[in-house]
């Protein structure tokens, strides 16, 4: 056979930018197909036509019978199979090398721009890389495919899987699984049915079964790689969608905190003046400062009726009543304030209105 080194060098480049299953597939292609085909299988089919014998001396009958028995030689059929199966990988390798070259050029441009900016002293905002150039990333020393390179790789696997299936089915339709030792030929110019004999049929059957098994293994690896990439992509999509849902469902500020702060049980009773009027109805139901933001925005100052509880605070704490007997009308006590003449304690000397006179 010809020299396989040229094809091997190209496939080594593909090996650098492949997944783990893809590297196993390339190993199977190198060792169990190309190596076996170039060393052992070629010697078994080297004397195929020369040792093909028929029971006739009719000129041309033997050649016609050989063409009927072997439309294409097994060894040449397998060479075509390897070429067609490897061609998608070569296309992927060309795309990968083009992407690497584009990334190198982009890095050189960025380095030149950084040098020019450093010389002029002007600050230059960093330019984000194009999405088409970031086609893989290294995680723990492993290359993880992404972007356009991943799409090309998936298309490569689909094409080579189709090729594998087509060649396996074609080999079965042409030859079956095993070669028969005796082949009966009924083609013209043979005057009658002629018996023809295949050389070393058992040895050839061993290689036929081996090559079909390797083709089946390659097909299984291609399907496994498709499943691996598809399942990985689905998990990434599901993970991103789940993260987006979690971000939208993040808990906001606790709105129920205000409702949980309940006033003491006697708080509403303290807000009644002497006439029995309430300054506000209920603490939990009337939050004036929270429920009237429009008044604050327009600059309007609410009165005591609008702001519940504020009159109570100003009456008892802000205003300081005068106790002088000669207080004028301008120094009246605030409405709702009533003095209590009861003694504050037993030791106090001040009189209370309800003390009994003796």
From Swiss-Prot:
It is found in: Cell membrane; Cell junction, Gap junction. Signal peptide: none annotated. The chain crosses the membrane at residues 20-40, 77-97, 165-185, 206-226. Abundantly expressed in the lung, also expressed in the kidney and heart. Residues 242-262, 318-358 are annotated as: Disordered. GO terms for cellular component: cell projection; connexin complex; gap junction; intercalated disc. GO terms for biological process: angiogenesis; artery morphogenesis; atrial cardiac muscle cell to AV node cell communication by electrical coupling; atrial septum morphogenesis; atrial ventricular junction remodeling; AV node cell to bundle of His cell communication; AV node cell to bundle of His cell communication by electrical coupling; blood vessel development. The modification Phosphoserine is found at residues 353, 357. Residues 1-19, 98-164, 227-358 are cytoplasmic. It is a multi-pass membrane protein. InterPro entries: Connexin, Connexin40, Connexin_C, Connexin_CCC, Connexin_CS, Connexin_N, Connexin_N_sf, Cx40_C. It comes from the Eukaryota. One of its GO terms (molecular function) is gap junction hemi-channel activity. Keywords: Cell junction, Cell membrane, Gap junction, Membrane, Phosphoprotein, Transmembrane, Transmembrane helix. It holds the Pfam family Connexin40_C. A connexon is composed of a hexamer of connexins. One gap junction consists of a cluster of closely packed pairs of transmembrane channels, the connexons, through which materials of low MW diffuse from one cell to a neighboring cell. PANTHER family: CONNEXIN, GAP JUNCTION ALPHA-5 PROTEIN. Belongs to the connexin family. Alpha-type (group II) subfamily. This is Gap junction alpha-5 protein. The gene is Gja5.
């Amino acid at each position: 056979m010809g020299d396989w080194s040229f094809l091997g060098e190209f496939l080594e480049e593909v090996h650098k930018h492949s997944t783990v299953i893809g590297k196993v597939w390339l190993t199977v292609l190198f060792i169990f197909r190309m190596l076996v085909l170039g060393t052992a299988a070629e010697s078994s089919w080297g004397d195929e036509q020369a040792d093909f014998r028929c029971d006739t001396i009719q000129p041309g009958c033997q050649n016609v019978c050989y063409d009927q028995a072997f439309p294409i030689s097994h060894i040449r059929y397998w060479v075509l199979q390897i070429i067609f199966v490897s061609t998608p990988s070569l296309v992927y390798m060309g795309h990968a090398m083009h992407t690497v070259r584009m990334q190198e050029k982009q890095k050189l441009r960025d380095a030149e721009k950084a040098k020019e900016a450093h010389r002029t002293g002007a600050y230059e905002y960093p330019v984000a890389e194009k999405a088409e150039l970031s086609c893989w990333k290294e995680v723990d020393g492993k290359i993880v495919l992404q972007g356009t390179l991943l799409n090309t790789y998936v298309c490569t696997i689909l094409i080579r899987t189709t090729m594998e299936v087509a060649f396996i089915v074609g080999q079965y339709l042409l030859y079956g699984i095993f070669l028969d030792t005796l082949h009966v030929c009924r083609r013209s110019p043979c005057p009658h049915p002629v018996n023809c004999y295949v050389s070393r049929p058992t040895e050839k059957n061993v290689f036929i079964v081996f090559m079909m098994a390797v083709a089946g293994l390659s097909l299984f690896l291609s399907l496994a790689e498709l499943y691996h990439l598809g399942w990985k992509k689905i998990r990434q999509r599901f993970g991103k969608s789940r993260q987006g849902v979690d971000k939208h469902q993040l808990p906001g500020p606790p709105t129920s905190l205000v409702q949980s702060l309940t006033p003491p049980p006697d708080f509403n009773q303290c807000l009644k003046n002497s006439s029995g009027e309430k300054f506000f109805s209920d603490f939990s139901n009337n939050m004036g400062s929270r429920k009237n933001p429009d008044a604050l925005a327009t600059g309007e100052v609410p009165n005591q009726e609008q702001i519940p509880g504020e009159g109570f605070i100003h009456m008892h704490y802000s205003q300081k009543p005068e106790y002088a007997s000669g207080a004028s009308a301008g120094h009246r006590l605030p409405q709702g304030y009533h003095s209590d003449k009861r003694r504050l304690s037993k030791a106090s000397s001040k009189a209370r209105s309800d003390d009994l006179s003796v």
